């Protein structure tokens, strides 16, 4: 890194984010050893770089998702006032104005630029210096602050500390005196270490910081000091304007700055604000000027400054050394507990068992170490990307490594060796086509065009969320370059395509994706929370057993030391160290199965959540229906009405090229109004646009033919083209000339200007030049609903709505086209025209009609989801009538059911927004309406026969909403009415990306566990907001969703749900099995302790390694059941459905072991334990009988808990598990049949001889136990619990239990009202 110099430029820049496509192995990397103890995680944060596809809102809670935390904890912990707007200063949308004092300046040589910037962006000061503390969540003593990290959707508390030397020395002494035990405790409980050795200190003078998230994750970071001799404003840029206290300089010269690196984000201390800020909103004042200024590049001093502030442009994950990984692994509580257990067993003379467990632990540590190291290295290799780039610095072009790029650097993207963007950048010249599938899941290539002067101002003004208008110029780090077109300079020379770096390193989109992988958010899924509560309860039981065993052994005269060892041994039995690891068994197998089916998961904890889905929302086009629509034909105006469909484009074009008739304009619209590009000899772009263009049979060219022919006759236009370096594509008809003698260039249409499709506007437009004529036209295509607002009323045919309704009712997709002549429009004027000027006063041309085919699997999947009582809804940007038709064809709506479509009452149009009225009219019958207040059908059945059929159909009506109505309902409808609508609405059409996101949140507010399946950039926000998002994309890992399917079929939804349910059931089964295994062994050992006996060394080994380990692993390999059941599996570990059978099984285990003990003691060959012996007794009939019968219990309880249908296949279909059970049963019977006390295995297992009749009894008792355990698990225990619960409710006169889910309660209320 270059050292800073004394004299530096005061220009500023900004930092942002880079992102690369990570492969499917990332899923397994999240399953690393530590994760099973650190708790579940989920990478759900969305980088700001793609937030233009995402409505930035905080997610509401749902049963399965991370509930939005209350800041009460952080406020109380750090004694802070939370800022009012929910964002820190660094995150505020008014970031540029928050701290600017009226009339005070910060810059000297940049004052004019900054004032112009603030004036043009209409930015006004909001807070003065004295209000900074409250606004920023700063404590009164300056020791703490709260910071909202928008990209991570994370709010953290930051506190400053200094080390108290005397208490630190005391801490060291305590660690020595306790032989390291205190060190381990403080290591596992870092809060207590911080409170013990640290003293609160203002952030300005602190030596180290603690940063704590709302999830309780704590980090201790040393403050670094970076030498830096320059002004403060050069670090924080023009974004922050601070009014300094009287008598102090508001832009001081500093010699160094203080910072910490938190999760690969740099937090720099601002001395005037007394708080740490993230360097992600840094803006260069030059960006407010035009692009020509930016193209001048940077000077050496500015480069050194920015390297110093932002660091290298490199995503370099810290790779821990082998010794660090080994220490972290060995000092984990799991292995410390193992070491404690091994020492304990050795002291109790269980040497063989202790040695085996030690070997297994060492192998496990080494295996985990190797796997973790390999995973980290692979992730580092894939996230780390460097390449040579040509950059313009100090007035010269030079080649440097991409790691040396800094914000503001101008580099060439047309370099053939550049295939992936090394940083987030803004396109300055030329255009390009990129693949952004790893960001949005959108498999369609995206076109990028050069930024304008207005774009530069928008770049300066945006904070965290990149506006949609800027995305067309924005090049995201890690995205692949498909094609780059160089700008036009002259007929013999092409220019270079240039881009300016905007964000570097971990601040890029790629960096945000990597961070979301390595720092996943915890999920609030109740299973994980309950499982650790259950472990705590088992530990308490172990303590109770400890006390009773100690008292019993004491009465038998056993030495105190032996009593302590034996009693502590009970704790290792009741709380087996491997118990937490069983939580991941089902998830691991599920992820492996999904990967084989082409479904990749970057968030393993979402697998179990998918098993609880209540509602799935689908996008339509490309998800439910085919992406590549077939064009049916076009309908053009004939006279005063729209005519029949024309399936051939040959008769649309007039022989007079200057004519302005409807058919010709429709043809020109289809030929030009698109964003297609040629890549490797093939057209790429939106499939709908490709179908539309191919229908015209015109040809597309990017060879600049038009520009070469125009210079002689249109000098002004030619000069402008060369100045602006424009390369417009051209399209040509399939014939050489109609009937007139036109040259080839006369027939060309040059696409002079393109206004790309915007979801909110639902249209796109182009400005087109006709050959060598001066004639220029504007052509627009978009949703039919928006045409009345941009077209002349008199241009619409009389049957406009009738024709539109006909096609949409029948499921066709309709695109409307319009055009107008641009009078006296030159090329230069066309480039300066605003979109509003082009898209107004248009003449309607006609309709393009596409056939909206369902995908072959859509109807089957929807039917299976409906059969499983998983609600399905459609959320699309398409026409509402088309969507309703598709919904009926796929089974989302009943074919003969009523669908009501609300629209705004025309009489209330003039009223204020909140007072507008909705008219709820049935699509199938214009005479049937819903009452706007009760949402009940309001119809007179006098004319409708038969009445019973009409009533039945109306009782089960559904609702379809459009985006504008949905927005009004969210803002103004009464909550109870809105909830009622959400319960009945199945179709949501004309929804913008932000409205899709908000719809998911609304469903989550009703306690639905929501899934969303989509395929494009418009779905990105909804995919992230949903509890389970499934993106249909070719990319293996996408930031768009936790799940990515490379197959463009919604069958992946069924696969995810089935495997999620199977994984959830497997997790419960494995956990219950480990719990009952502990219970069986605890009961056995507790009974034996009454006679100072215990199991033998190899008996413990046989149970733990030969029986338990294979069963626990292989019982999780059961595949999901082929059909979805109506009822979802429970996710509550402490529910009666789980606890009742568990308690019943424990009682049954006790009874079987007690009966076995009573019978063996009555046998004439019974060998009792030695009386009054202080040594451990192993070789006696009590131990032999209980060991053998418990072996059957370990095996059979595994079979009982290996649940089959309706969530998993039948247990015998799990062939590996079946084989293990059979082998173990054979081994157990063999041990029972041993007779000769001289037999090797008799001696090894320290067994005593038994009679033939008793052996038969043990086998019979094992079979009886299995039958009782199986029937009890499946029928008896639950039935008994339900009966007792019902009887208790009757006696206490309690009401029936009310569902915790709001939507279920609302449905019940609706049914009661209908009755």
Curated annotation (Swiss-Prot):
Membrane-topology descriptor: Multi-pass membrane protein
Catalytic machinery residues: 619 (4-aspartylphosphate intermediate)
InterPro entries hit by this protein: ATPase_P-typ_cyto_dom_N, ATPase_P-typ_P_site, ATPase_P-typ_TM_dom_sf, ATPase_P-typ_transduc_dom_A_sf, HAD-like_sf, HAD_sf, P-type_TPase_V, P5A-ATPase_N
Catalytic activity: ATP + H2O = ADP + phosphate + H(+)
SUPFAM superfamilies: Calcium ATPase, transduction domain A, Calcium ATPase, transmembrane domain M, HAD-like, Metal cation-transporting ATPase, ATP-binding domain N
Enzyme class name: translocase
Annotated localization: Membrane
GO biological process: intracellular calcium ion homeostasis; monoatomic cation transmembrane transport; transmembrane transport
GO cellular component: endoplasmic reticulum; membrane
Extracellular-side positions: 162-167, 348-350, 552-564, 1092-1099, 1160-1180, 1237-1253
Keyword Cell inner membrane: no
GO molecular function, one term: ATP binding
E.C. number: 7.2.2.-
Segments on the Cytoplasmic face: 1-139, 191-324, 370-531, 587-1072, 1118-1135, 1204-1216, 1275-1315
Keywords from the named record: ATP-binding, Magnesium, Membrane, Metal-binding, Nucleotide-binding, Phosphoprotein, Translocase, Transmembrane, Transmembrane helix
Keyword Thylakoid carried by entry: no
Transmembrane residue ranges: 140-161, 168-190, 325-347, 351-369, 532-551, 565-586, 1073-1091, 1100-1117, 1136-1159, 1181-1203, 1217-1236, 1254-1274
One family name in Pfam for this protein: P5-ATPase
Superkingdom of origin organism: Eukaryota
List of residues binding Mg(2+): 1015, 1019
Protein family (similarity comment): Belongs to the cation transport ATPase (P-type) (TC 3.A.3) family. Type V subfamily.
Name of the featured protein: Probable cation-transporting ATPase C1672.11c
Native source species: Schizosaccharomyces pombe (strain 972 / ATCC 24843) (Fission yeast)
């Amino acid at each position: 890194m270059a050292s800073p110099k004394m004299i530096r430029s005061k220009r500023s820049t900004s930092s942002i984010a880079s992102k690369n496509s990570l492969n499917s192995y990332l899923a397994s990397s999240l399953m690393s050893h530590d994760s099973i103890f650190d708790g579940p995680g989920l990478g759900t944060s969305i980088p700001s770089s793609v937030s233009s596809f995402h409505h930035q809102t905080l997610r509401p809670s749902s049963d399965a998702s991370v509930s939005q935390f209350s800041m009460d904890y952080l406020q109380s912990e750090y004694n802070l006032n939370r800022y009012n707007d929910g964002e820190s200063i660094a995150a505020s949308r008014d970031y540029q104005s928050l701290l600017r004092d009226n009339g005070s300046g910060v810059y000297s040589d940049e004052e004019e630029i900054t004032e112009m910037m603030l004036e043009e962006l209409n930015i006004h000061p909001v807070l003065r210096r004295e209000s900074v503390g409250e606004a920023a969540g700063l404590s009164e003593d300056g020791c703490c602050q709260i910071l909202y990290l928008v990209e991570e959707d994370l709010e953290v508390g930051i506190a400053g500390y200094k080390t108290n030397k005397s208490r630190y020395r005391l801490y060291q002494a305590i660690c020595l005196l306790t032989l390291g035990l205190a060190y381990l405790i403080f290591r596992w409980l870092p809060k207590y270490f911080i409170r013990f050795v640290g003293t609160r200190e203002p952030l300005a003078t602190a030596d180290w910081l603690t940063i704590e998230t709302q999830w309780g994750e704590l980090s201790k970071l040393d403050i670094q000091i970076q030498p830096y001799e320059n002004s403060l404003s050069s670090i924080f840029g023009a974004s922050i304007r601070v009014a300094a206290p009287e008598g102090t300089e508001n832009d001081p010269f500093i010699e160094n700055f203080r910072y910490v690196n938190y999760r690969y984000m740099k937090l720099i201390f601002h001395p005037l604000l007394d708080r740490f800020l993230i360097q992600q909103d840094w803006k260069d004042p030059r960006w407010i000027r035009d692009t020509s200024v930016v193209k001048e590049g940077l000077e050496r001093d500015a480069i050194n400054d920015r390297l110093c502030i932002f660091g290298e442009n490199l995503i370099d994950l810290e790779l821990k050394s082998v010794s660090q990984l080994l220490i972290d692994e060995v000092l984990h509580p799991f292995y410390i507990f193992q070491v404690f257990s091994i020492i304990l067993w050795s002291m109790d003379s269980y040497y063989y068992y202790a040695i085996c467990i030690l070997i297994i632990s060492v192998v496990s540590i080494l295996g985990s170490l190797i796997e973790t190291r390999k995973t980290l290295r692979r992730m580092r290799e894939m996230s780390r990307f460097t390449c040579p780039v040509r950059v313009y610095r100090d007035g010269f072009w030079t080649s440097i490594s991409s790691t040396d790029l800094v914000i503001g650097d101008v580099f060439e993207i047309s370099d053939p060796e550049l295939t992936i963007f090394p940083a987030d950048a803004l396109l300055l010249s030329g255009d390009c086509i990129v693949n952004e599938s790893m960001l949005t899941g959108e498999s369609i290539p995206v076109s990028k065009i050069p930024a304008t002067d207005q774009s530069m101002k928008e770049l300066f003004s945006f904070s965290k969320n990149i506006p949609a208008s800027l995305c067309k110029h924005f090049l995201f780090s890690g995205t692949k370059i498909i094609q780059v077109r160089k700008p036009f300079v002259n007929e013999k020379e092409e220019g270079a395509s240039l881009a300016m770096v905007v964000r570097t390193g971990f601040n890029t989109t790629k960096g945000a994706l990597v961070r979301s992988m390595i720092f996943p958010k915890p999920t609030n899924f109740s299973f994980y929370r309950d499982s650790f509560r259950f472990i705590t309860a088992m530990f308490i039981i172990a303590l109770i057993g400890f006390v009773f065993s100690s008292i019993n052994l004491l009465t038998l005269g056993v030495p105190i030391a032996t009593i302590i060892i034996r009693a502590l041994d009970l704790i290792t039995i009741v709380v087996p160290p491997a118990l937490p690891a069983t939580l991941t068994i089902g998830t691991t197998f599920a992820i492996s199965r999904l990967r084989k089916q082409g479904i990749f998961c970057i968030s393993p904890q979402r697998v179990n959540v998918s098993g609880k889905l209540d509602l799935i929302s689908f996008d339509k086009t490309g998800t439910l229906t085919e992406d590549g629509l077939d064009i049916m034909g076009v309908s053009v105006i004939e006279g005063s009405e729209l005519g029949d469909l024309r399936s051939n484009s040959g008769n649309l074009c007039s022989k007079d090229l200057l004519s302005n008739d409807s058919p010709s304009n429709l043809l020109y619209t289809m030929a030009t109004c698109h964003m297609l590009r040629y890549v490797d000899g093939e057209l790429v772009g939106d499939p709908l646009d490709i179908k539309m263009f191919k229908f015209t049979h015109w040809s597309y060219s990017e060879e600049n033919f038009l520009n070469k022919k125009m210079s002689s006759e249109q000098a002004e236009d030619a000069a402008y083209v060369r100045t602006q370096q424009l390369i417009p594509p051209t399209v040509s008809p399939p014939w050489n000339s109609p009937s007139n003698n036109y040259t080839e260039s006369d027939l060309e249409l040059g696409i002079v200007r393109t206004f790309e499709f915007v979801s909110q506007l639902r249209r796109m437009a182009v400005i087109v030049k006709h050959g060598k004529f001066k004639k220029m036209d504007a052509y627009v295509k978009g949703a039919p609903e928006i045409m009345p607002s941009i077209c002349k009323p008199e241009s619409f045919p009389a049957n406009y709505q009738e024709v539109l309704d006909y096609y949409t009712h029948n499921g066709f997709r309709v695109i409307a086209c319009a055009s107008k002549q641009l009078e006296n429009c030159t090329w230069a004027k066309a480039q300066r025209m605003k979109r509003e000027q082009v898209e107004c006063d248009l003449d309607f041309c006609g309709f393009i009609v596409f056939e909206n085919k369902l995908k072959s699997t859509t109807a089957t999947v929807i039917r299976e989801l409906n059969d499983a009582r998983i609600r399905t809804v459609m959320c699309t940007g398409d026409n509402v009538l088309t969507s309703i038709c598709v919904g009926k064809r796929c089974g989302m709506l009943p074919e003969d059911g009523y669908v009501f479509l609300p629209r705004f009452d025309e009489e209330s149009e003039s009223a204020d927004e909140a007072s507008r009225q909705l008219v709820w009219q049935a699509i199938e019958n214009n005479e049937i309406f819903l009452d706007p207040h009760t949402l009940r059908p309001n119809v007179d059945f006098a004319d409708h026969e038969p009445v019973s059929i009409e009533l039945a159909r109306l009782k089960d009506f559904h609702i379809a909403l459009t985006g504008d109505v949905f927005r009004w309902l969210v803002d103004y409808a009464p909550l109870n009415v809105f909830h009622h609508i959400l319960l009945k609405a199945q179709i949501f059409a004309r929804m913008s990306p932000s409205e899709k996101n908000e719809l998911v949140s609304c469903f989550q507010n009703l306690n639905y566990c929501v899934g969303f399946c989509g395929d494009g950039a418009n779905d990105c926000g909804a995919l992230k907001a949903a509890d389970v998002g499934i993106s249909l994309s070719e990319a293996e890992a996408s930031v768009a969703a936790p799940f990515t399917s490379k197959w463009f079929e919604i069958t992946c939804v069924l696969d995810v749900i089935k495997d999620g349910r199977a994984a959830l059931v497997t997790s419960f089964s494995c956990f219950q099995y480990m719990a009952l295994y502990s219970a069986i062994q605890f009961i056995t050992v507790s009974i034996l302790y009454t006679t100072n006996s215990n199991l033998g060394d190899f008996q413990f080994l046989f149970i733990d390694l030969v029986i338990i380990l294979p069963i626990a692993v292989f019982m999780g390999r059961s595949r999901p059941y082929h059909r979805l059941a109506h009822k979802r599996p429970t996710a509550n570990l402490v529910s009666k459905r789980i606890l009742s059978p568990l308690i019943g099984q424990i009682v049954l285990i006790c009874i079987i072991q007690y009966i076995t003990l009573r019978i063996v003691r009555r046998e004439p060959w019974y060998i009792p334990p030695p009386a009054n012996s202080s040594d451990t007794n192993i070789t006696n009939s009590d131990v032999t009988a209980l060991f053998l019968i418990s072996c059957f219990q370990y095996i059979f309880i595994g079979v009982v808990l290996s649940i089959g249908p309706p969530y998993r296949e039948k247990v015998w279909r799990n062939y590996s598990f079946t084989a293990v059970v059979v082998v173990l049963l054979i081994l157990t019977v063999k041990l029972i049949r041993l007779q000769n006390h001289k037999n090797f295995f008799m001696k090894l297992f320290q067994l005593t001889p038994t009679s033939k009749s008793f052996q038969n009894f043990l086998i019979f008792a094992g079979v009886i136990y299995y039958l009782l355990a199986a029937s009890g698990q499946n029928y008896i225990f639950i039935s008994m619990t339900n009966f007792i619960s019902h009887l208790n409710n009757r006696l206490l006169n309690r009401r029936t239990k009310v569902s915790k889910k709001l939507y279920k309660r609302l449905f019940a209320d609706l049914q009661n009202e209908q009755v």
